[in-house]
A protein has these predicted regions:
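Hydrophobic membrane-insertion alpha-helices, especially the h-region
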Residues: 20-33
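Membrane-interface motif at the C-terminal end of an N-terminal transmembrane signal
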Residues: 31-45
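Intrinsically disordered, low-complexity segments enriched in small/polar residues
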Residues: 14, 78-79, 153, 255, ...
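Active-site-adjacent loops and short helices of periplasmic peptidoglycan-processing enzymes
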Residues: 41-224, 228, 233-237
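N-terminal Lys/Arg-rich, disordered targeting/topogenic segments
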Residues: 1-18
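Secondary-structure junction/capping motif
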Residues: 2, 159, 186, 266-267
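Domain-terminus/edge residues, biased toward the C-terminal soluble/receptor-binding domains
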Residues: 203-204, 217-220, 224-276
């Protein structure tokens, strides 16, 4: 990491066994995750003995998809907590124990709003280069007055890293568009990539239309899918670095060679220390 970035960032029985396996598949399938396990016991059948010898090697074994995930197929009560009627859906996931501590309507369809930006960030980190300079297009304009932007302008030159900071800290919708065009060439192509990658993560109850989350009827997800996406994001150290910042100063270059600075503050009250 360059010194410049450091300066700009501020931190703060056989049958019985077979049934058990089938049930495991049902649970995993209900959680938008899939895995196939096969178990059988053989006694003296040459064909099965050959199969065991030739095909039971580690080369042919794969880790079940949900092995490292928190999985639940139904609501999970939390001792001492009564479901809040105002909640559309909620989940509390213990990543260390890989368990769902609380789950309420985990698989109900909901509109993700700005949590959409998690998927945008995930793809930027997966396919982009942080030091790449991104040229901003006219697509970043036209947002309504009450829709959050970082102040990007057509022709501006911004590093992908800075766009990620604006996206994740301030929830800048313009940064989401700039990232989408950088990765895929257009918002529409990026939305297709978002949907492909969401399915790879097991988020099969999700469909994206844009990179920022501004409401569209065909743009939706579930609480559990959001967990899957966020869980994928936090495997990346840069993602964790950015969301831990208390502020960041973006640099935007113009056609004349001038550089403009823009401080972005988190819209997350936890990051700002305004709540506990």
């Amino acid at each position: 990491m360059s010194r410049r970035r450091r300066r700009r960032r501020k931190r703060r029985n056989p049958a019985g066994r077979l049934i058990a396996l089938v049930l495991t598949l049902v649970v995993a399938g209900g959680a938008a995750a899939g895995g196939i396990w096969y178990y059988a016991e053989h006694s003296g059948n040459p064909l099965t003995e050959y199969a065991d010898e030739k095909y039971n090697a580690d080369l042919y074994r794969a880790e079940p998809f949900s092995e490292t995930l928190c999985v639940s197929a139904e609501n999970v009560a939390l001792d001492g907590f009564t479901d809040e009627p105002s909640l559309h859906a909620a989940g509390l996931f213990n990543l260390n124990e890989r368990s769902v501590e609380y789950g309420y309507r985990l698989y109900d369809k909901l509109y993700p709003a700005s949590t959409t930006k998690l998927m945008t960030a995930y793809l930027a980190l997966k396919y982009g280069k942080l030091e790449d300079m991104v040229t901003v297009t006219d697509s970043v304009t036209g947002f309504a007055a009450d829709e959050v932007v970082c102040g990007l302008y057509p022709g501006g030159q911004v590093k992908l890293y800075d766009l990620l900071c604006g996206l994740l800290l301030k929830s800048g919708n313009d940064c989401g568009v700039a990232i989408a065009e950088y990765i895929s060439g257009s918002v529409e192509a990026f939305a297709e990539l978002m949907n492909e990658e969401a399915k790879k993560l097991g988020a099969t109850g999700t469909h994206f239309v844009n990179p920022h989350g501004l409401h569209e009827d065909d743009h939706y997800t579930t609480a559990y899918d959001l967990y899957l996406i966020f869980n994928a994001c936090i495997q990346n150290d840069t993602f964790k670095e950015i969301i831990s910042m208390s502020s960041y100063t973006m640099s935007i270059g113009d056609a004349a060679g001038n550089t403009h600075s823009l401080e972005v503050l988190p819209t997350n009250y936890y990051s700002l220390g305004k709540t506990e």
